[in-house]
Amino acid sequence: MALNFKADTSALSRLPTKRKLAGQKAHLEMYRKLAKYSSVGHLLKFLAIDHPCPTRCQLKIFFEVCLGNRIADCVILLSCGETRLCYIIELKTCMSDSPSMYNETRLCQRSQGLCQLSDALRFISFNAPAGRQKWHLVPHLIFKSQRGLKTIYTETPQFPTNIIHSSPDKLASFFFSRADREVSEKVHAPDAGGQEKMAAKRRLLVPKSKALRARRQRLIERNKKACFKSQEKRARR
């Protein structure tokens, strides 16, 4: 489905604060869901992205990447043999999961999203570190419902500049240095139950020799404290 409408994005600034906060919350929920996927195929399916061989791909993902005067919600580096793709994801969230795109707010969101993607691609093409490998820049606009993150609409616009030459490590560093650290910490922060599981897992992963040394050190410190208290009692007598 192709939409050829241009809307006045100033309508988005008139949205109530409650709706804006709901959108921010949905963004963070989506980032967390993306970070939890262990299967590249499932992650791409969630984003409604088709790929011929997702099981053989290497993937790196970055959240809220500053690209000049724009912030890309998500950047994904996907390499499969000689095929290297850089997806720039722009996420728009909606209160309703209705598939219709013909309302003022969604038309404004679409118009804004396409402008954001165009500027982001232009910045990458001029500023990405040079290298020998060819990378295809793929802009991807996706609309999700705020409840359940159901896909409502997707669009991959065609822009004139869509190829750069770089290297995997340099390009990854380029996006990593521009990703929002605070958002990344929130995305990867486990919940209370998750923290307990991680702590237990770390304890299990500690080698026995280290665990024994740690226990001995605790016993030594405990004995020192006991001796110190004993000396204090004697001194008082």
UniProtKB/Swiss-Prot annotation:
Pfam families: Herpes_UL24 (PF01646). It comes from the Viruses. InterPro entries: Herpes_UL24. Belongs to the herpesviridae UL24 family. This is Protein UL24 homolog. The gene is 20.
